[in-house]
C-alpha cells in the first residue's frame, strides 16, 4: 500500500529532476515488454479508455487506520473531560492541568478527520484517455477535471516510499521544465521488477493511444463494475484474489483487515460524474464496436 500523491501530495512547482529525465516514458517510443492492465479498466472502446486512479485499490486503509486512532483519541478526550470536570466539581482547581493533553488531542482529531475526507469523497477518480481528440482527462479529488493534450504530458517513473516506484504524468509549465501538476497511474511496484511492471502498464496505455485498441483489448481479462454503481463486497474480494493470483495467497489477509474501512469509505462516497462537455467530447462508436468492453461483458 502506497499513498504518495494523496498523503503526502506529489511535489510540484519545481524543476524536473535528472532521475525523471532518465526514466521518462515517451509517447512515440514503443516498449517491447509484456502488457499489463492491472485490473484497472472501467471501459474501453474504439474512441476512449477509462481507468481508475492509483488509490482505488487501497481505498479504505486510511479510513480504517485513522478510524482506530480517532477512537483512541476520542476515548482519551472523554476520560480527560470526565476526570477534569469531576475534580473541578470538588473545588480541586489544580486539576485543570489534566486538560493540557487536549491541546494535542483536539487538533489531532481535526487533522485526522481531514485525512479521512480524502477517502470518503468519491468512490474513485477516473482517468480517461481519448485517442480521437488526443486528450487526457483526470478527475480531481475536489470534483474538478484536468484536461490536457496527450502529447503535452511528461510521463515518467519516480521513486516514492519503501523502495516503490510510481508511474506518473507531469503537467509542465510553458518553460517545459517546471512541474505544475502530477497525476499517478494505477500501477505502483517494488524495486526493479515493480518498475518493469509499471512500464508494461504504461505501454498498455501508450499503445492504445498511439496504435489503437486492437493491440490491447485482448489483454483485458475483466473490467471494474464501478462505472455507475459502487463496488460490492463480493466483487471486492474477487478483485483482490484475482490481483494476488489466488484466494489462498497469505497477503490477502492484509487486505481483509482493512475491508471494514473500505466498505465505510465506499458507502459514504459519491460516484464521480464527468462534466457534460467532457462526455460530449467522448462519444462512443455508433452501432457495433468490436473493441467495446465494460463490466457487463466480464466472464
Give the ranges of each region predicted by the language model:
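Juxtamembrane cytosolic face of transmembrane helices
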Residues: 116, 122-123, 153-171
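N-terminal topogenic membrane-targeting module
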Residues: 122-142
Amino acid at each position: 500500500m502506497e499513498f504518495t500523491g494523496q498523503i503526502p501530495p506529489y511535489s510540484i512547482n519545481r524543476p524536473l529532476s535528472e532521475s525523471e529525465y532518465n526514466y521518462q516514458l515517451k509517447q512515440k517510443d514503443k516498449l517491447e515488454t509484456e502488457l499489463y492492465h492491472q485490473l484497472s479498466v472501467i471501459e474501453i472502446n474504439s474512441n476512449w479508455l477509462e481507468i481508475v486512479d492509483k488509490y482505488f485499490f487501497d481505498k479504505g486503509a486510511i479510513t480504517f487506520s485513522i478510524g482506530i486512532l480517532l477512537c483512541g483519541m476520542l476515548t482519551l478526550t472523554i476520560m480527560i473531560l470526565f476526570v477534569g470536570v469531576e475534580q473541578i466539581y470538588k473545588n480541586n482547581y489544580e486539576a485543570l492541568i489534566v486538560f493540557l493533553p487536549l491541546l494535542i488531542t483536539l487538533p489531532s482529531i481535526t487533522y485526522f478527520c481531514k485525512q479521512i475526507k480524502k477517502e470518503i469523497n468519491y468512490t474513485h477518480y477516473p482517468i480517461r484517455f481519448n485517442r480521437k481528440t488526443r486528450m487526457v482527462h483526470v478527475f480531481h479529488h475536489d470534483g474538478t477535471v484536468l484536461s490536457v493534450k496527450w502529447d503535452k504530458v511528461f510521463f515518467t517513473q519516480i521513486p516514492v516510499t519503501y523502495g516503490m516506484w510510481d508511474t506518473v504524468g507531469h503537467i509542465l509549465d510553458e518553460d517545459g521544465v517546471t512541474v505544475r501538476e502530477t497525476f499517478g497511474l494505477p500501477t505502483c511496484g517494488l524495486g526493479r521488477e515493480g518498475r518493469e511492471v509499471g512500464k508494461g502498464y504504461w505501454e498498455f496505455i501508450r499503445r492504445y493511444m498511439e496504435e489503437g485498441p486492437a493491440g490491447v483489448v485482448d489483454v483485458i481479462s475483466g473490467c471494474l463494475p464501478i462505472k455507475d454503481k459502487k463496488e460490492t463486497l463480493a466483487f471486492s474480494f474477487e478483485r483482490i484474489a484475482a490481483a494476488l493470483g489466488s484466494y489462498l495467497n497469505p497477503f490477502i489477509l492484509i487486505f481483509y483487515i482493512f475491508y471494514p474501512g473500505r466498505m465505510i469509505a465506499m458507502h459514504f462516497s459519491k460516484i464521480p460524474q464527468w462534466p457534460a462537455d467532457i462526455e460530449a467530447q467522448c462519444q462512443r462508436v455508433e452501432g457495433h464496436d468490436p473493441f467495446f468492453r465494460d463490466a457487463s461483458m466480464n466472464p
